[in-house]
Every structure is written in C-alpha cells, then in structure tokens.
A protein has these predicted regions:
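Generic structural signal for short, solvent-exposed loop/turn connectors between secondary structure elements
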Residues: 1-3, 21, 167-181, 245, ...
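Bacterial Sec-dependent N-terminal signal peptides
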Residues: 1-23
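Basic side chains
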Residues: 2-3, 60, 110, 288
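Generic hydrophobic-segment detector
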Residues: 3-6, 28-29, 143
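Generic N-terminal initiation segments characterized by hydrophobic and/or small/turn-forming residues
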Residues: 4-9, 53, 153, 258, ...
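Extended substrate-binding grooves/exosites of carbohydrate-active enzymes
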Residues: 25, 32-33, 40-88, 287-292, ...
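Active-site mouth of glycoside hydrolases
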Residues: 30, 35, 40-41, 46-256, ...
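Extracellular glycoside hydrolase catalytic/binding regions
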Residues: 182-184, 197-199, 203-351
Length: 361
C-alpha cells in the first residue's frame, strides 16, 4: 500500500510540474511570411479577396512597463481615480487586457524598454523612462514588469516586437559603448529566459538619434551585432524602424530579418503602396516580411484606409493610437496613464477588423 501511495504522489508531482510549465510560443519567418509554432499565421485565409496568410497585425503598446524616474514630471501621469502614478498598476492592467486583445484577433504588439512619448507626440521629453541604465546595464524593476508581459504573451501565443531604445531617452545613455552594452544585456536576457516569441527592434525611428549604433548611418551595425548574440545556438530576429513615410536605407534593408515601416504622415492610403513598393524595389531587398508597427491613421469604417492598403500590398499593419488633447481617459493606447481596455470607438474599429481576419475563410 505504501508503494502505491508513493507512486501516486510521484505521478501527481510530475503532473503538477508539467502544468507549471508554460507552453512556449515560437515566432519564425519563412520567406515573407510569419509563422507561429511552425504554422503560418491565418493559414489559408483571405480577407476581402486579399491574402492574409503570414501577416502579423499588431498594435503599438510601447508603455506597458512605463515609469518615470524624474520627480519633477511624475505628477503628469497620475490616475484620474487615485491621483497617484503606479507603474505596477499600469503593467497589471496591461496584462489583464492581453487575453481580450488576443480573443479579438491581435497577434502581436510592440513594447519598448524606453517606452514612447507618454503624451503621444512631444517637442520636449523631460521624463526619464528606461529599463536600460546609462551604462547599458538593466533596471530589474522594469525587467520584472516586462517578464509579466512576456510570460502572458507566451501563454496566449502572441508575438512581441521588443524595442530597445527610444529617441526621447537617448540623452540618458552615457555613450555609444553603453548603447552596445544595452543591446548585449537585453538580448542575452531574452535568450536566457528562453523567450521564443520575441522580435527585436533596435530603436524606434532611428532618424532622430545622434549616438553611433543608433543613428541612421550606423544602426545597421547594431542590427548585425544583435544577430551575433546567441544562447544555446539561438538568436533573435532583428530590425529597426524609421520615421513615418521613410524608406529604410539599403544597408538596413540588407541586414534586417524583417523590414519595419511607419505610416505616420501618410494621409493618402495610396502612398502606403508606394512606400512598400519602394522597399521591394531596393537592390538590397531579398524576400522577407514587411511590417508597419506604427501608423496613427484610422478611418476603419471606410473601404480604403492605410490598414487596407498595407494588406493589399502584403505588408502587416500596426495600430498607433494616442489620447488627443481633451479626449477622455478611455482613448488611446500610449498616453499615460493608459486605459488598456478596448473602450473607445477607434479601438473598437481596429479590433473589429482583426475579428474579421480571425473569422475569415
């Protein structure tokens, strides 16, 4: 009897351990298609007569681990109900809403170790928000919040486009050596935690940086460097982004695993086609996915908009929505404090299209 009881306890222990292990979500690229766990996204599906297999619709949710290390600006981000800023609450509410986004059809989102402007667009950025310290080491309070998000994304089979640097925070980095250290430390952290659902964006809109390794003349070297960092024979898929309407340099197109574009400033949807075609016509381009991960144009109720034209050009599209002046708390996914729920008409318009994709044949 004792042996039977012991065997049962061992069996229960094994089952318990197996349940504790999170299923790994792995993103990969085959040609110009994204695969999740060995299968193309939206396998075999079309939408309005357009191929969507292999595309990666996404949203810019860069401030999921936001905090402000500057006492003089922290007051700007207080919640309307508590009148206090709370970085842990921000991440907690982000994670709580992730299943709702996934259920509506969102496959991926961009988050950044230095966030993005908590005001949407800003002329001056006095706040200090960075998971990367001035010397390139990592701030573990930020990384612990990031882990909550990456773990949940892994569970939900969602892909994370992880940005490292944001131009508003470049001034807090010591020098180009610290930038390189930051790349090394962040990539090694991702690999050693065995996250396989992460795509890497070196920096958001490289046009605006001055430091070597981040500026448009040298960022291709950082892409190449990040690709050399491995753990157990595995590396991350790497790219970077430029400002709205810009086409990446031939050097960046050549070394990137996928191409990132921004649609800000593109008011005529036909210009989306021009931008995508310009990438494919580059002599440096080889077959690889093209992804918008920032576009602040909507009009989702109209037959033609930037989302539709990107899809028609076979490029994944990314939704960027921030709360405009005098808009209520529910608006936008970037301004802090953020309402991470789908509680505005703009958000509902975007997610309604994703639901159409999810249910497409």
């Amino acid at each position: 009897m004792r042996k039977i009881i012991m065997l049962l306890l061992v069996s229960l222990s094994i089952v318990s351990c197996n349940k504790a292990k999170s299923p790994k979500t792995e993103v990969s690229i085959v040609g110009d298609e994204f695969y999740i766990n060995g299968k193309p996204t939206f396998e075999g599906k079309t939408w309005r007569g357009m191929k969507i297999q292999g595309l990666l619709p996404n949203a810019r949710l860069v401030n999921g681990i936001f905090d402000d290390k500057t006492d003089s600006t922290r007051y700007k981000w207080v919640y309307p109900d508590t009148k206090v800023w709370d970085a842990n609450r921000n991440t907690k509410e982000f994670v709580e809403n992730m299943p709702k986004w996934q259920e509506k059809g969102l496959l991926a989102f961009t988050i950044n170790l230095q966030g993005g402007s908590p005001e949407g667009y800003s002329k001056k950025q006095a706040w200090h928000n960075s998971a990367i310290m001035p010397d390139g080491s990592l701030d573990m309070e930020y990384m612990n919040r990031l882990k909550l998000i990456l773990d949940k994304a892994d569970e939900l089979q969602m892909v994370v486009i992880l940005g490292l640097y944001y131009f508003g925070q470049e001034k807090y980095m010591n020098d180009s050596v610290s930038v390189k250290n930051g790349i090394k430390n962040a990539v090694e952290w991702i690999l050693k935690h065995d996250y396989r659902n992460v795509l890497l964006e070196i920096n958001n809109e490289c046009d605006f940086y001055k430091l070597d390794g981040l500026n448009p003349e040298t960022v291709h070297k950082s892409i190449e460097y990040a690709k050399t960092i491995t753990h157990n024979g595995r590396r991350l898929l790497v790219s970077t982004s430029y400002a709205g309407k810009k086409v990446p340099s031939d050097k960046v197109i050549a070394v990137s695993d996928f191409i990132l574009l921004h649609g800000n400033s593109i008011r005529n949807p036909e210009d989306i086609t021009v931008q995508v075609d310009s990438v494919r016509k580059s002599t440096a381009y080889t077959t690889k996915p093209i992804v918008y991960n920032e576009d602040d144009h909507f009009k989702f109720d109209e037959e033609v908009n930037n989302f539709v034209k990107a899809t028609d050009a076979y490029a994944s599209w990314g939704y960027f929505d921030f709360r405009k002046k005098d808009e209520p708390f529910e608006q936008g996914f970037q301004c802090i404090p953020a309402d991470w729920g789908i509680n505005s008409e703009r958000k509902k318009g975007f997610f309604n299209i994703l639901t159409e994709w999810k249910n497409a044949q």
